Amino acid sequence: MMNERVNKVALIGAGFVGSSYAFALINQGITDELVIIDVNREKAMGDVMDLNHGKAFAPHPVKTSYGTYEDCKDADIVCICAGANQKPGETRLELVEKNLAIFKSIVGEVMASGFDGIFLVATNPVDILTYATWTFSGLPKERVIGSGTTLDSARFRYMLSEYFGAAPQNVHAHIIGEHGDTELPVWSHANIGGVPVQQLLEKHAAYKQDELDQIVDDVKNAAYHIIEKKGATYYGVAMSLARITKAILRNENSILTVSTYLDGQYGVNDVFIGVPAVVNRNGIAGVTELELNETEQAQFSRSANVLKDILAPHFAE
């Protein structure tokens, strides 16, 4: 028993997303140990107490505690959910100035602890802040992962499942690019239970392209609609973070549309962006390069360029 590996996750930021992520980790029994770190010590301690009180109902006993940056030293994953929130009407990219300063401090503190694991970034604009985390940390690019378009792809699969009357698990479709306004659907590879969506459109008059275009629009604007109604989005992204965490800790080699570094794939260099990638215990094991059609490739290149334009003033090559 003494030689058994203990999985440890350090969560930085016990706001809506962070506390929902902690709740998901415990309810799914994904990790053995969870330490919660927040500038608001009382909030983090309250979360720990609340979560521990439900431990009898969890599938796996997760040791949950309040901690400091020093506790990151032996963590397998440090998940960063801290940062300024997106306000109504504010785009994810408008958050960049505020959150870059916050991240420089956080990542510096984590690395000073001796941390040598995997960073998982959730804070928006996630593609920019994942790049920042990689730069500030000095870790290999494979060990810095952003939530990317995992949630966007899940939203897409859910909406397509409702439209076509199939379980989301049987809908295979990706949203790639920036987690934001320039993201795009990969229709050329979308299928329902193995049947290409394009084929379903051709064979069934009930299915219409303009209705599918509306689904894409709904996916892109989902966060804005939720923020209008309840002030923030957190359950969906927390579940996507839990899914990525599970893929890492259980060495799954699962393909997820995370924000990862591109070094020539899809004709793009030096940017973190949402694409399908193999995720395992080492972080990113490889990028899955879909063969995009001409329209998709142009849209993806534009998305990457939008991110690079935002990075340029802050990170000189």
From Swiss-Prot:
Residue positions where Phosphotyrosine is found in the record: Y224
Pathway: Fermentation; pyruvate fermentation to lactate; (S)-lactate from pyruvate: step 1/1
Top-tier EC class: oxidoreductase
Active site feature: H179 (proton acceptor)
Xref: Gene3D superfamilies: Lactate dehydrogenase/glycoside hydrolase, family 4, C-terminal, NAD(P)-binding Rossmann-like Domain
Inhibition and activation profile: Allosterically activated by fructose 1,6-bisphosphate (FBP).
Residues binding NAD(+), per UniProt: V17, D38, K43, Y69, G83, A84, S105, A122, T123, N124, S147
Domain of life: Bacteria
Binding residue positions for substrate: Q86, R92, N124, P125, V126, D127, D152, S153, A154, R155, T233
Gene Ontology terms: cellular component: cytoplasm
GO molecular function, one term: L-lactate dehydrogenase activity
Positions annotated to bind beta-D-fructose 1,6-bisphosphate: R157, H172
InterPro entries with a match to the protein in the record: L-lactate/malate_DH, L-lactate_DH, L-lactate_DH_AS, Lactate/malate_DH_C, Lactate/malate_DH_N, Lactate_DH/Glyco_Ohase_4_C, NAD(P)-bd_dom_sf
UniProt-listed Enzyme Commission number(s): 1.1.1.27
GO biological process: glycolytic process; lactate metabolic process
HAMAP family: Lactate_dehydrog
Family according to the record: Belongs to the LDH/MDH superfamily. LDH family.
Function: Catalyzes the conversion of lactate to pyruvate.
Subunit comment: Homotetramer.
NCBIfam families registered for this protein in UniProt: L-LDH-NAD, PRK00066.1, PRK06223.1
Protein name (database record): L-lactate dehydrogenase
